[in-house]
Amino acid sequence: MIYSKVFLKLHWGFSVVKPSAAKAKSGFYLPPPTTLIGALSYGKFRGIDNTNLGKIYGSPAYNFRNVMATARLESEGAYTEDIVRNVISYFQRKDRRDNPRYIYGVIPTGKVYMPNGTLVVVYVTDSMSKEELEKLSWSITRIGGKECLVSVENVEIGEAKKVSGRMKTRYYFRDTVKVVGKKEFLEYVTFWEENGYIWGKEGGPIRYILPVATYPLASKEVEVEAKEAYEVGGEYVVFS
């Protein structure tokens, strides 16, 4: 297994809304694995929004489903819900949908503001070469929405050493992982799995634990009992 640790400089922050979000779009404190994998795949599939996956169609990011990803905040930030002008016609009654008065509305949308802050993303995989992983890591341009621009400050490539047992981490992990010691900085969220890359299918929900303080928003270190984890440049990322 190899890993890529990517240090991303956020231009203003990022916004990734929660699954099944409707008219009120609350957001995540950290981008989920599917968002991180989509950002990595952009360097290879830029300009391709749809791909044939056999008998189905979906996002080209589906080809990267064997890549494991997680993230943490290197800087402090703030979560807020901005008022954003969005299309709301599909929430209206059928007789209202063609009325210009009901096409747009103001919607509270979750965002993490961290101007000039740093987001650290780790990818672990055995499905590509070090050279390709490094090239794609340097090609990341945004996280989340198209306006959530980032600049790659540094990329660290190396061998991911598989470990298990007790360890400390600041990266998020699935809630099936046992947390030991203090449990004061734990936020439970629902992400989704890779079937969400397939058009017309909904990704199954997966519960994760984010070791963060919510205000100011910052990643915190927690101790866990891991079955599958990897040492990546002096840190640990936990996947089960």
UniProtKB/Swiss-Prot annotation:
GO terms for biological process: defense response to virus. It comes from Saccharolobus solfataricus (strain ATCC 35092 / DSM 1617 / JCM 11322 / P2) (Sulfolobus solfataricus). Part of the aCascade ribonucleoprotein complex. Keywords: Antiviral defense. CRISPR (clustered regularly interspaced short palindromic repeat) is an adaptive immune system that provides protection against mobile genetic elements (viruses, transposable elements and conjugative plasmids). CRISPR clusters contain spacers, sequences complementary to antecedent mobile elements, and target invading nucleic acids. CRISPR clusters are transcribed and processed into CRISPR RNA (crRNA). The keyword Phosphoprotein does not apply. The keyword Iron does not apply. Belongs to the CRISPR-associated protein Cas5 family. Subtype I-A/Apern subfamily. InterPro entries: CRISPR-assoc_prot_Cas5_N (IPR013422), CRISPR-assoc_prot_Cas5a-typ (IPR010153), CRISPR_Cas5_sf (IPR053725). This is CRISPR-associated protein Cas5 3.
